[in-house]
Amino acid sequence: MSLSLFIARRIYRESDGGKQVSRPAVLIAMAGIAIGLAVMIIAVAVVIGFKSEVRNKVIGFGSHIQITNLDAVSSYETHPIVVGDSMMTALADYPEISHVQRFSTKPGMIKTDDAFQGMVLKGVGPEFDPRFIKEYLVEGEIPVFSDSVSTNQVLISKALATKMKLKLGDKIYTYYIQDDIRARRLTIAGIYQTNFSEYDNLFLLTDLNLVNRLNGWQPEQVTGVESVSYTHLTL
């Protein structure tokens, strides 16, 4: 006799008198087990889906790998690294890396007549991959980022726009503190919404040249390099 058949018979009949258990009781027990398993499967699927969504958004904002100055870890202001064409080419030659882009950041503050909010201005160049942010763009368009022509257009999150009472096309005043206070007026070209508050409440996306000028850096100096996606990389 197989083990499964033995267990089934023990469940179906009482061990003392061989009296058959009522069919409704068996059906109720089976239904309870089925519902319990279904709830467990759904819960696991939701958790896996949530983890995957969070992972994709973290990578979309930050990338799989970032190369930055070690001093930037313990400092409010970012410290640059020198990234020339040769370094970009060398990184792009790795078959495991599908995309490489430069970026620079500058912490600052948005101020309106009614409110102010801390933020980080992230600048990207012409090699910027717009696919992630385009997926979550709810208004406007993504500016064209170029090495030769600088722009003061910026992408802002819907959460920040709502909090600061801003809309598409508005001029916003941003302030930055280093040796002295610097102010820049930016134009809202697009509004995105990822519903990932850790990033939506923090990042504004703009031109790499603009951020480099705010930092007082040379053209080949940037905060870092990020690989937006890769299949496998052995360090």
Regions from the PLM with identified roles:
Residues 51-84:
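Membrane-interface junction motifs in transport/secretion proteins
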Residues 66, 153, 224-226:
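Short aromatic/hydrophobic contact patches that present stacked aromatics
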Residues 69, 227-230:
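Short beta-strand-to-loop capping motifs
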